[in-house]
Amino acid sequence: MSSDTLHKYEALPEDHRNVALRPCLIEEFVGQTEVIKNLKVFIQSAYERREPMDHVLLYGPPGLGKTTLAHIIAKELKVNFRSTAGPLLSKAGDLAAILTNLQPMDVLFIDEIHRLNRNIEEVLYSAMEDYCLDIVVGEGCGARTLKIDIPAFTLIGATTRFGLISNPLRDRFGIPLHLEFYSVDELVLVIKRAAGVICTSIDDSGAREIASRSRGTPRIALRLFRRVRDFLEFERKHGTIDGNFANSALFRLGIDGAGFDKMDLKYLKFVFEAKGPVGIDTIASALSEDVGNIEETIEPYLIKTCFIQRTPRGRVLTQKGFEYLLSSKYI
């Protein structure tokens, strides 16, 4: 795996290994303090009323725990968990087949819900509000609508592109929850918990070194932790991951002190060399990257940490970004 892709948030082949590291209960979940406080109320209230929980929309940058939270909600409600993804639902019949096979109170999780086409969205409207499906049978003058009742259920949608969800769909989610980037202290806890699960010794300095380069994202923190553990097992067989060892391993992986990899640095240097606002299409062409990938995986953290700024005319490097490139001798 190249260092260019090590930080990126798409589901890479090894991501299924992180399932074992996921918390199963809401009390085990680290971070997102306000979200968790509110979720506890919503879950407990629905459980005591023996009703399906209101529909939930989880949104925010990739890798912050949206899928994990969906699993936890189902677990805490003691109901079945069903899942699919927006791109997998190509026609209304696909969604109808899933909805009619749900059991009462089930949780249905739709990842990348912003990628649903409008025809499928319209099927969801009546399903979410009235627990029924309006199916059109026949064509032309002979067409008629059949109303099919479905079990009461909870829909959990997850998206990294909140603005791409249509207003009618967005308004049908009674519980919208925004997930924020993690602090270094929170990521230290995530890493230490993972180390305990897979029986790897790591001290505070080692966990903090990895956490500080994880771009505020648990998925990245766990991936970097696994790679540092690989170096430990290869070079020492046994021992503890300390700050010096973690720093050395991350340097070999091409991750700098701010957590930037080669693709991030290419982005920053290109914007610097443009000497002014530069459009996203121009950046994507220069980096040979998809516009959506840049907007979802590279830019959020750079904007959050004030290294770049979005303006109506394009992206510009901030003073902080310029000083970082200069002090790190990247320019």
Swiss-Prot record:
Origin: domain of life: Bacteria
Q: Which GO terms describe its cellular component?
A: cytoplasm; Holliday junction resolvase complex
A single GO molecular function term of this UniProt record:
four-way junction DNA binding
Pfam families reported for this sequence: AAA_lid_4, RuvB_C, RuvB_N
Q: Which residues cross the membrane?
A: none
Locate the region Head domain (RuvB-H). Answer: 257-331
Name of the protein in its database record: Holliday junction branch migration complex subunit RuvB
Q: Which organism is it from?
A: Anaplasma marginale (strain St. Maries)
Q: What is the lineage of its organism?
A: Bacteria, Pseudomonadati, Pseudomonadota, Alphaproteobacteria, Rickettsiales
